[in-house]
Amino acid sequence: MSIEVSNESGYDVSEPELISVARFVIEKMDVHPAAELSMVLLDSAAMADLHMRWMDLPGPTDVMSFPMDELEPGGRPDAPEPGPAMLGDIVLCPEFAEQQAAKAGHSLGHELALLTVHGVLHLLGYDHAEPDEEKEMFALQRQLLEEWVADQVEAYHADRQSEKDRRLLDKSRYFDEP
């Protein structure tokens, strides 16, 4: 799986964290492991330009998704197996997201992770134009974000335990050579 991030926003964000959450969602949604995704982080002016050009709406927004390939389960009928697909581009605006994060009472990192999940789901065909679609998409978005956070917490604790074990073993005389 290839996930590229281009940060043109001027904000210092954790690109590895964005890649981690995108990869987690793509894997959880059973997308082919050779799928490709591009993420671009823009400043408010550039995002406002995209928002007007593609959605005919003024001002910046938090996230926009641009699907690349038409996704078909299993690929072509005559294909031996599904091949890699370019899912598309997710465009994030950290400046706009920072304002939303402040209103919601959480960090910019949390908001960008949420928006990344949202963007990937759009690339996979989910939408929230209708109330039923919104309910389904937002519930899945919340579930995936919670699972990713739990996965990150578990990995953090495992790393800390490994470090404690290593320090303990380093102090032990049991493993010294005779």
Curated annotation (Swiss-Prot):
Top-level taxon in the UniProt lineage: Bacteria
One Pfam family recorded for the sequence: YbeY
Key words of the record: Cytoplasm, Endonuclease, Hydrolase, Metal-binding, Nuclease, Ribosome biogenesis, rRNA processing, Zinc
Cofactor(s) demanded: Zn(2+)
GO biological process, one term: rRNA processing
EC number: 3.1.-.-
General function of this protein: Single strand-specific metallo-endoribonuclease involved in late-stage 70S ribosome quality control and in maturation of the 3' terminus of the 16S rRNA.
Protein name: Endoribonuclease YbeY
Organism annotation: Mycolicibacterium smegmatis (strain ATCC 700084 / mc(2)155) (Mycobacterium smegmatis)
Gene designation per UniProt: ybeY
